[in-house]
Structures are given as C-alpha cells and as structure tokens.
Amino acid sequence: MGCRHSRLSSCKPPKKKRQEPEPEQPPRPEPHELGPLNGDTAITVQLCASEEAERHQKDITRILQQHEEEKKKWAQQVEKERELELRDRLDEQQRVLEGKNEEALQVLRASYEQEKEALTHSFREASSTQQETIDRLTSQLEAFQAKMKRVEESILSRNYKKHIQDYGSPSQFWEQELESLHFVIEMKNERIHELDRRLILMETVKEKNLILEEKITTLQQENEDLHVRSRNQVVLSRQLSEDLLLTREALEKEVQLRRQLQQEKEELLYRVLGANASPAFPLAPVTPTEVSFLAT
C-alpha cells in the first residue's frame, strides 16, 4: 500500500512555482488550463492504479504458486516419510515373525525328538517282548519235540521187546510202529504248521502296528503344523489390523496438521494481501479424494 501512495505521488506532475504579483500592474485573469491539467492527472492516476493492480495480481499469483509448490513438496515429504515408516514396520514385523517361526520350529523339533525317542523306546520294548514270546514258543516247541522223541523211543523199545517175547518175529511189529510213527509225524507237522502260521500272523500284526504308529506320528505332526499355522495366521491378522488402525490414526493426524498448516497459510496470505483484498484464485482445501489417496 505504501508503494501505491509513493507511486501516486511520483506520478503527479510537478507544481509550477508561484510568482509574486507586481503591485504596479493590475491583476490579470488566469488562463483556462485547469481542465486539461485535471484530465492528464486522472489518466496518470488510472495508469498508476492499473499498474499497481497488475503488480498486486502478479504478487497474488506468485504467492499462490509458492503455496501450491510448498503443498506438493509437503505432500511428497509426508508420503516418503509414511513409506519409510511402513517399510520399517514391515521389516520389524518380518523380524518378529521370523523369530516366532524359529521358536516354533525349535519347539516342534524338541517335541518331535521326544516323540521319536518315546516311539523308539516303545518299539524296542514291543520288539523285545515279541522276541521273548517267539523264543519261549520255540523253546516250548523244542522241549515238546524232545519229550515226544523220548516218549516214542521208550514206547518203541517196550513194544519191540514185548512183541519179540510174544510173537518172536519183528516184521509185523515194525509195520505197526511205522504206521503209528507216520501218524505221529503228521500230527507234529500240523502242530508245527499251526505254530508257523501264528508266528507269521504275529509278524504281520507287528508290521501293521508299525505302519499305524508311523501314520499316527505323521498325522500328529501335520496336526501340530496346522495348529502352528493357524496361530501364526491369527497373530499376523491381529498385527495387520493394529497396523491398519495405527496407520489410519497417523493419516488423520497428518490431515489435521495439513489443514492447520493450510489455515495458517491462508491467514498469513490474508494478512499480506490485506483485509479488503480478496484473492483472485481460491486456495484448494483438503478434499476427501486426497485423504483417500494418502490412505492408499
């Protein structure tokens, strides 16, 4: 404003020096030059006012351009800071998840080793028990065979002596004894085959038990893995929800700060331009589109 007054004062034509009237001469009538002089002064004032308005408009445009540039720089800086913060959070989450996965893996390894030791111990006990059963049955079979052999020998000896005393010829006796021995051998063979079938059945049952134990161990391991994955998914979803809430709160704070900064700039611009001067270009307020853009 001060420049305007100085400009107007500089644009005024210079005043003519007044000459003192001579007392001897009668007063002369003033020339009629007031009208043209006032017209030139009005034109000069209008030109100065238009130049001042043009300069004022340029100042407003420059201030608005500076405001837009500062707003863009501020938005870019906020976006970079937000990206860095999100990247740091993601790195921290990755480190935390890796630590948790490592701990869970160690726990699974420990439980797997314990289960492996328990199953190995139970398998050894079952194998030793079955081996003891097989050895006991084998010894019983051998003892039975030895006993039958002794009984047969004693019976054969007694019958042979008695037959010789009664008949004097051993041929018929040997035929009868051979038939009885053949019958006994057939019975023993059937008994042996029965014991063999039982042993084979026990081996088959043992193999099936081992296969079932392996399947149970595999299913338990898969069940534990599924439980661990579900717990990790729940923890990750909760963490992401918390991060989303924190990001929204930070975004709201940034939007409030931006509005406050914009309001301060508008007040400063209002003070610079004056209370009566209205800017030709209105300031762009914070729109919901910009907020959603920052949120994404």
From Swiss-Prot:
Feature: compositional bias, Basic and acidic residues: 19-33
Modified residues (Phosphoserine): 154, 241
Gene Ontology terms for molecular function: microtubule binding
UniProt region (Disordered), positions on chain: 1-41
GO BP annotations listed: spindle midzone assembly
Signal peptide start and end residues: none
GO CC, any one term: nucleus
Protein's name according to its UniProt entry: Coiled-coil domain-containing protein 69
Subcellular location: Cytoplasm, Cytoskeleton, Spindle; Midbody
Family classification: Belongs to the CCDC69 family.
